[in-house]
């Protein structure tokens, strides 16, 4: 089972980059400022948002996600997937004055399962309560050093990184 989970994590990470481009990923560390915080990304409702726009008074929680990763959506009968916790996490963040955004940087499947139309359908089916934006060319993911989905980054009100990692310890 561990081998299957490791393989799935590797596949999800690889889907976040394109084979045509060789891009060195950054590595954000606690205290680092959020790169590209003012970069506009298209939400599933057509609106353009940046992290600055979506931040609450105490910061912003950025969750890299997609419609297809088994760690996000689960694997039938084997694992539950993290996306069923997204709304709970977003609700807790909102109570603390923190904005939340889901970022889809899966360029490899942009014309298929992770297209804007599929993102809209997936968000509706999952009942997302936060913006779900597309990271064209995986620019934000590369700037953050996001390697897998889900990958979580919590920034304070000054856009300094406080946490980077998984959603919880499950």
Go through the PLM ranges and name each one:
Residues 6-17:
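Bacterial N-terminal signal peptides
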Residues 73-125, 139-140:
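Structural microenvironment flanking redox-active thiols in thiol-disulfide oxidoreductases
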Residues 50-79:
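Short active-site neighborhood of thiol/selenol oxidoreductases, capturing the structured segment around
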Residues 21-52, 81:
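N-terminal "domain-start" segment that seeds a small globular fold
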Residues 119-156, 162:
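Short, internal strand/loop/helix patches
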Residues 1-5:
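Positively charged n-region of N-terminal signal peptides that target proteins for export
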Residues 57-60, 95-100, 127-131, 149, ...:
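Loop/turn elements at helix/coil->beta-strand transitions in domains of secreted/extracellular proteins
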Residues 160-170:
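Non-catalytic, surface beta->alpha helical segment in thiol-disulfide oxidoreductase systems
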């Amino acid at each position: 089972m561990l081998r299957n989970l490791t393989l799935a994590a590797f596949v999800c990470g690889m889907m976040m980059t394109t084979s045509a481009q060789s891009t060195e990923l950054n590595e954000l560390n606690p205290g680092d400022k959020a790169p590209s915080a003012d970069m506009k990304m298209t939400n599933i409702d057509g609106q353009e948002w940046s992290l600055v726009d979506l931040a609450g008074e105490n910061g912003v929680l950025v969750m890299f996600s997609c419609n297809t990763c088994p760690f996000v959506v689960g694997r039938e009968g084997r694992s539950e997937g993290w996306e069923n916790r997204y709304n709970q996490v977003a609700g807790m963040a909102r109570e603390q004055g923190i904005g939340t955004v889901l970022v889809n940087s899966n360029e490899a499947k942009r014309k298929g399962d992770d297209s804007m139309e599929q993102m809209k359908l997936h968000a509706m089916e999952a009942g997302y309560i936060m913006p779900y934006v597309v990271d064209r060319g995986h620019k934000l993911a590369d700037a953050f050093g996001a390697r897998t989905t889900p990958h979580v980054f919590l920034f304070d009100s000054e856009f300094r990184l406080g946490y980077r990692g998984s959603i919880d310890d499950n």
